[in-house]
Design a protein with these regions (language model features):
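A structural feature that tracks compact, well-ordered secondary-structure segments
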Residues: 118-139, 147-149
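Conserved active-site and cofactor/substrate-binding residues in soluble primary-metabolism enzymes
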Residues: 1-4, 120, 124, 153
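Conserved small/polar residues in nucleotide/adenosyl-binding loops
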Residues: 159-161
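Active-site-proximal beta-alpha loop/turn segments in soluble metabolic enzymes
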Residues: 111, 142-147
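Cytosolic regulatory regions of ion transport systems
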Residues: 73-75, 138, 145
Length: 161
């Protein structure tokens, strides 16, 4: 009897969770697609942040560009529009570039604010992408939006999902 009761609770919880996820996904906001991006991965150093600041000052007034960054414990990624590549490489000269990946696209998706209180949203999205054979190079997120970085060839298949 206890096992059956636990099973009913589990099924009920599963239904409520998937219902909440579906509701959030139906209320997704804007989806923005950007192409011709380059992903730079640099080793963390004492001079990396000052160089990022210098780079941001140089591109501050540039219109219609893509720029995002994320910092881990040992490395920092900077993703930029291809047109910014010469400026970035000049400013970051002397830094250790671990990897550079060209020909990338990004899809940025805005989620409703309640997404942070509902477990499983990202799992649901990434599971579906995996089933469709979409390879994700990187994911960068804020509280209410996330950006999926992938090869430009993959972006068309993602849009059709």
């Amino acid at each position: 009897a206890i096992v059956m009761a636990l099973k009913r609770i589990s099924e009920s919880h599963e239904f409520l969770s998937s219902h909440k996820i579906t509701r959030v996904l139906k209320n997704m906001g804007d989806i923005t697609v950007r192409s011709s991006l380059i992903d730079y991965c640099y080793k963390i150093s004492e001079t990396l942040l000052p160089k990022q600041s210098k780079f941001l000052n140089q591109i501050d007034l540039t219109k219609n560009i893509f720029y995002t960054t994320s910092r881990g414990v040992a490395e920092s990624n900077i993703i930029v529009s291809q047109q910014l590549s010469p400026i970035l490489e000049s400013v970051f000269e002397g830094e250790t570039c671990i990897e550079k990946t060209n020909d990338l696209s990004a899809i940025s998706i805005k989620l409703p604010t309640e997404n942070v209180t509902i477990p499983g949203i990202y799992y649901f999205i990434f599971q579906r992408l995996s089933w469709e054979g979409v390879n994700i190079n990187e994911v960068i997120s804020t509280s209410n939006e996330f950006t999926i970085l992938m090869n430009e060839d993959s972006v068309l298949s993602l849009i059709h999902i």
